[in-house]
Amino acid sequence: MGRFEGKVVSIVGAASNDNMGQVMARRFADEGAKVVVSGRNEDRLRALANEINGDWVHCDFSKKTSINAMIDTIVERHSRLDVAINSTGWGLLVPLPENSEEQLDQMIDLQFKGPFVWLQKLVQTMESTGGSIIQISSATANIMLDDHAAYMGTKAGTDHLIRCVANQYGPQGIRANSISPGLTATPMTAEPLKSAALLAEFESCYPLGRIGTSEDIAAAATFLASDECFMTGENLQVNGGLCLRRNPLGTELFDAMVAAGEIPAA
């Protein structure tokens, strides 16, 4: 019997092929959970749910009504919700002065307001049963990365929301934690990682000598969600030791790519 046998696990942000959400969904399903995947691409959600013998519910994580309806639907269909994971994100790369108000609004809606509403609904849903809440954050909530101000700021904000939930709702049996990956090989990072020079520059910042994988994050998530985990309010640094050092500067990445002949000098 898997350690999540009989448990219902909700994973938001599982509609992109082979992203963190999908890899986590497969890992939880392999360990016995009934996994409900959510996102905006219904065809991909349906295919994943069929693959893992799970369920799917459409959700636009920037809309309060959609988030609340998703959680209500899961409980209506499965009579419980034991684990809830948010892996949504938008890797916006824009210099601070060039960040438009529209981009900022979109980032806040997806990466701060959405998680806030999600947590509001979850504490109401889990207050009589307990449960585990996991937010996928980012090492950049604490470690600087050039031209990612809106992304980093909203991720840092959600880390604090998680601590608020953990502090106030622990007596109700609700545990809330976050995971901070560093640079991770996912569809979102596939294009920049085509640069061997860029990849090498990032890997030089990791004491373990490599960037992360979605499987690394899935392993951490199953631990945090398990009954063996006596942790709440924590931000788990799953980034190969990047948190001990720093990300490369934008100028360092540029110089490395120029030296490798991948891009022309300015």
Report the location of each language-model feature:
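Active-site helix of classical SDR
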Residues: 119, 154, 162
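Short, small/polar-rich loop/turn modules that mediate ligand/substrate recognition or access, typified
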Residues: 170, 175, 231-233
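Substrate-binding pocket helix/loop in short-chain dehydrogenase/reductase
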Residues: 95-96, 100-108, 148, 198, ...
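Alpha-helical segment proximal to the catalytic Tyr-Lys
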Residues: 124, 167-171
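Short C-terminal tail/terminal secondary-structure segment
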Residues: 143, 232-266
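C-terminal substrate-recognition "lid" of short-chain dehydrogenase/reductases
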Residues: 116, 210-238, 243
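Canonical Rossmann dinucleotide-binding motif of NAD(H)/NADP(H)-dependent dehydrogenases/reductases
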Residues: 2-34
